[in-house]
């Protein structure tokens, strides 16, 4: 039943995306859910990079330390030039969308709405947070979102409590974040999107370039020996070749229309034991008191010595 509702959620999200976004390889972090048990490979690479081939920087901000059962915010920043437009699925130009994945330590999860302060409610308004799976609530997906409004994605996080969950322990943990702006270059099935460079499948001479009614272009390449091969270039990428031109296998037939990219960043967070902080404060207080007593004792000794010298 859980798997049914998960599939239903994905279907609704995809349907909404089709209604409100042009059909294209959007910044859909949930594509990874369908093909990967974990969004992070053994090498440390986040699987979103398999479809978003260009590398772009991101930033992630989390508190240095948090206490059990506390609510805090984690921020994934996805900067880019908002004046730039990307190629949409129909070949037209439009704004970039963004998406993010946040991999937290075990036990951390999205905070329930009734635990959010007003300021955090305002920062997270309009954002839908989705766990990677039913048993991986600590891995959170967001997107696609319009990049003009969400270059900073705020995650409201609830820290676990080792006092009530014995599987959780105090200590330092790794946090992994990934974020992308713009469409992917490859679909999950391995097929190129129209946000990619199209290349010559064989070496030969371009004998014809014919526009198709759907906006795509048929490029026919004839080798010296053998049959001609047709490469269909979808609407969007711009052709950089002409009829009669000789090309080698793998040569670019179009420009690279991609203006986006994916990035990932690692950081750390400490689940701090409040009792440890209390004992640390007691220790500092004891040290301070000892120093004060030593100073007072020293002054007392100096007074006695001064009194003895006066006789």
From Swiss-Prot:
Pfam families: Apocytochr_F_C, Apocytochr_F_N. Keywords: Electron transport, Heme, Iron, Membrane, Metal-binding, Photosynthesis, Signal, Thylakoid, Transmembrane, Transmembrane helix, Transport. It comes from the Bacteria. Heme binds at residues 28, 48, 51-52. Residues 1-27 form the signal peptide. It comes from Thermosynechococcus vestitus (strain NIES-2133 / IAM M-273 / BP-1). PROSITE patterns: CYTF (PS51010). Belongs to the cytochrome f family. This is Cytochrome f. The keyword Transmembrane helix applies.
């Amino acid at each position: 039943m859980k798997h049914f509702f998960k599939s239903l959620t994905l279907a609704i999200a995809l349907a909404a995306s089709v209604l409100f976004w042009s059909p294209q390889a959007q910044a859909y972090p949930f594509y990874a859910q369908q093909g990967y048990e974990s969004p992070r490979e053994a090498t440390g690479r986040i699987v979103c990079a398999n479809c978003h081939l260009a590398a772009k920087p991101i930033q992630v901000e989390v508190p240095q330390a948090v206490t059990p059962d506390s609510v805090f915010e984690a921020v994934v920043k996805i900067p880019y030039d908002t004046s730039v437009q990307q190629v949409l699925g129909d070949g037209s130009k439009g704004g970039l969308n963004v998406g993010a994945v946040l991999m937290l330590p075990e036990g951390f999860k999205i905070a329930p709405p009734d635990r959010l302060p007003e300021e955090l409610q305002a920062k997270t308004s309009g954002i839908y947070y989705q766990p990677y799976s039913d048993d991986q609530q600590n891995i959170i997906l967001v997107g696609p979102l319009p990049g003009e409004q969400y270059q900073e994605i705020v995650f409201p996080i609830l820290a676990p409590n080792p006092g009530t969950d014995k599987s959780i322990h105090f200590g330092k943990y790794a946090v992994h974040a990934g974020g992308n702006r713009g469409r992917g270059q490859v679909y999950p099935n391995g097929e190129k999107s129209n946000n990619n460079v199209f290349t010559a499948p064989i070496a030969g001479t371009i004998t014809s370039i014919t526009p198709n009614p759907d906006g795509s272009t048929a490029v026919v390449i004839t080798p010296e020996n053998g049959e001609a091969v047709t490469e269909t270039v979808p609407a969007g990428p711009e052709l950089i070749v002409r009829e009669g031109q000789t090309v080698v296998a793998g040569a670019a037939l179009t420009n690279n229309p991609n203006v986006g990219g994916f990035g990932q960043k690692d950081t750390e967070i400490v689940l701090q034991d409040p009792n440890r902080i209390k004992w640390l404060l007691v220790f500092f207080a004891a040290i301070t008191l000892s120093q004060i007593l030593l100073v007072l004792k020293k002054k007392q000794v100096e007074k006695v010595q001064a009194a003895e010298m006066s006789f």
